[in-house]
Amino acid sequence: MSEFVTVARPYAKAAFDFAVEHQSLDRWQDMLAFAAEVAKNEQMAELLSGALAPETLAESFIAICGDQLDANGQNLIRVMAENGRLKVLPDVLEQFIQLRAALEATVEVEVTSASALSDEQLAKISAAMEKRLSRKVKLNCKIDKSVMAGVIIRSGDTVIDGSVRGRLERLADVLQS
């Protein structure tokens, strides 16, 4: 997967720089998100790994995307198809989002809990993470019953596991060693 990230980075950077220059970050993120979903589609994945000519592949991909891509987005698709890189579109989107977050000095934080958290709890988590990361945070909340109780907080390569499940797993590791 790190190979795809390396391959995706220059495309994401080019799209990001273009979007910043033309003040169209939202539009580009939407286009990349749509194109990434198309690339993830099972039938499209088969086409991407097939032996279609790059021009045919690009035009098919653009036709499927329809009016979701403007002329510049279509050009990106053509260049990526020419280089056989359409399958890395989800990674391009991920890199684009990271570049945008760095520009806006925000970081996405994933909060996983066993049940929905109150606004007060979310505010406390947000404040604590902003202090710890020295950046504004955007919380993405998920519910996972297997957490049992507590929360798991992920931001980049930082993981704070305050869940009962995590504590039980650590206890089991200690008891088995």
Curated annotation (Swiss-Prot):
Keyword Ligase: no
Gene3D superfamilies, A to Z: N-terminal domain of the delta subunit of the F1F0-ATP synthase (1.10.520.20)
Superkingdom field: Bacteria
Main location: membrane
Keywords linked to the UniProt accession: ATP synthesis, Cell inner membrane, Cell membrane, CF(1), Hydrogen ion transport, Ion transport, Membrane, Transport
Membrane topology: Peripheral membrane protein
Pfam (any one): OSCP
Single GO MF annotation: proton-transporting ATP synthase activity, rotational mechanism
Family note: Belongs to the ATPase delta chain family.
Subunit structure: F-type ATPases have 2 components, F(1) - the catalytic core - and F(0) - the membrane proton channel. F(1) has five subunits: alpha(3), beta(3), gamma(1), delta(1), epsilon(1). F(0) has three main subunits: a(1), b(2) and c(10-14). The alpha and beta chains form an alternating ring which encloses part of the gamma chain. F(1) is attached to F(0) by a central stalk formed by the gamma and epsilon chains, while a peripheral stalk is formed by the delta and b chains.
Name of the protein in its database record: ATP synthase subunit delta
Organism of origin: Cronobacter sakazakii (strain ATCC BAA-894) (Enterobacter sakazakii)
Encoding gene per record: atpH
